[in-house]
Amino acid sequence: MKHKNIDEIKKLESLPKIINLFSDQEIKNISELYNSLPVTVHNQKQNIIKKRWLQNCNKSLDAMYISKLKEVLGEFKMDNLKSEKGEDFFGLFHESFSPLKLHVDSGFEEKDIIFKQVVTPLSPIGETIIFKNKWYGRSTSFTIDED
């Protein structure tokens, strides 16, 4: 199912950008936060560990992260999972030991206006491939396997 606000989404599209937004010390602080967070998912088949950036675990780091994103994006709303209390998580950490399958993170609700993806690598090892193709449906994974 496609998003209902496709025209608005298309107006916000731009080419991918690589921006060195965080200092080495800030990346170190985010890495330390990652190491302190509980594992949310350990998908052994895909060899991925996922953790949620819990709000208020480190309030100064929360404020720094949001402030830095606003410098680049302006005002924004995160499309994230919610805690049991209804609070937004500041994103998900993915520690991947194998390539991720082809997927799109385009929001969960058809009325959402998807905006930008922010990827913050915490190590110099690894690559992210961004395709020029567009997908205007909700978040999904792609496969040629019909089963």
Go through the PLM ranges and name each one.
Residues 1-147:
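Fe(II)/2-oxoglutarate oxygenase catalytic core
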